[in-house]
């Protein structure tokens, strides 16, 4: 696994490398007042809103690009979709866009008693491609190589991750998540990233790898998965 990268608020400027936070890191916790769910718990999965890098068609990966105004609007739509649900625990990654989106969602959920960070849900690392626009890469190299690095399952870009690598860490997260949900009998919300959502949906919706690679995750969509307690 390549090391995680944290960037300054200025778009795309790297400041340091960190060890990945693989595993649940509790960010906030308060006394639980929410009753345990019965029979089935819900996992609510959604993508962060549009970022400046998304808007400009840049490879984002682990760069800490923040939400645009449209991105906040996307997050507010997700928040409204989940407004009437009961959410006990919420997950985000270390990336600002994930935190900003979750913050909008949780405005309607005073019942949430725990917020957890887990970077196994990080976006796919695009390595040396990060910060380049898609068009810049195609002009410098070729459309064929673009397709290989952008949508190949098992070929990573230079210094980055393949989707196979992303899938491995996401499946590790899902394994721990299912144990957590069954133990605590609670609904959870997850503010994730486009590429980490693909293997997540593959697991619950039973897609093969080829189908998974074609999945599109809209900025304002919410996916609900039921877990038997």
Q: Where do the protein language model's features map onto the residues?
A:
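Beta-strand elements within well-structured catalytic alpha/beta cores of enzymes
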Residues: 42-47, 91, 186-192
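Active-site-adjacent alpha-helix immediately C-terminal to a catalytic or transition-state-stabilizing loop
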Residues: 33-36, 52, 99, 171-229
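Short, well-ordered beta-to-alpha junction loops that form the rim of enzyme active sites
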Residues: 49, 93-95, 120, 151, ...
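Loop-to-helix element that buttresses phosphate recognition and phosphoryl-transfer chemistry
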Residues: 44, 50-101, 105-108, 157-171
